């Protein structure tokens, strides 16, 4: 059985907050420079080997004069959170297990540590991450089925498969907190010497913790903490609601058996920080995303900005003409 302690997940994909900020900032800066140099951020992806090609440089008289504005780091963050929630919605619609949803979201998060959303549209990458997660977790769904189920061209899924895998460095084994929750709840039954009544209450604790993990997956926590830490943070929050056991005593029991080098006070601090990240989570609505989505569309296809301006001008002209006609009729 695979072991998290010796995994690439633990070795290569758990970061400090500053590391994440640096990576997102670098990707945003690169995309911004691409927009200035080429007049667009769109990269062409070879579907066979995942190699990239840039467009022809924009003429000197066009560079910097198109009026297309790059997304800010904060706008990129909102875009990522929005599509991470979309991953959950799609997986729920297909009735995929939590493990597939979690793996797809972690793939998505890892991908956008390498790239800006201005370089690869998250709607397309989202689908490829779900498809890749299904393959790795042996829940076989064809690209055609997935595309048809959400009314998207399945070829987009396949075209982005290699660039996603390469961006993940082919580290495809992901550890999610859901399995850790199951293990800890079983352990809590022994700790509480649970009878029939306690057993049902522990199952309620488990279900609430799973819902808490669903929220955690939309924060930075999966890139900052181990699955075990995430699971215990979710169970701690759930226990605050159900009040089934003395959680501090339970943690002491876990630490005494695992002979952990980490002081329990430090671990409790991590749990509190994870739950703080969840409390701070704000999921943008489609209305919130409208302006950001328009900016992204213009970055990927600057000609769309001209079309948008023409429509706005035409709409204003119609409104003005209607107002004039109304005055003539009065």
Swiss-Prot record:
Expressed in roots, nodes and internodes, and at lower levels in shoots and leaves. Expressed in the intercalary meristem of internodes and at lower levels in the elongation zone and differentiation zone. Keywords: Cell cycle, Cell division, Cyclin. It comes from the Eukaryota. One of its GO terms (molecular function) is cyclin-dependent protein serine/threonine kinase regulator activity. Induction: By submergence in the meristematic zone of internodes. It holds the Pfam family Cyclin_N. Residues 297-330 are annotated as: Disordered. Coiled coil: none annotated. InterPro entries: Cyclin-like_dom, Cyclin-like_sf, Cyclin/Ssn8, Cyclin_C_2, Cyclin_N. GO terms for biological process: cell division; regulation of transcription by RNA polymerase II; transcription initiation at RNA polymerase II promoter. One of its GO terms (cellular component) is nucleus. Involved in cell cycle regulation. May be a regulatory subunit of CDKD-1/CAK-R2. Belongs to the cyclin family. Cyclin F subfamily. This is Cyclin-H1-1. It comes from Oryza sativa subsp. japonica (Rice). The lineage of its organism: Eukaryota, Viridiplantae, Streptophyta, Embryophyta, Tracheophyta.
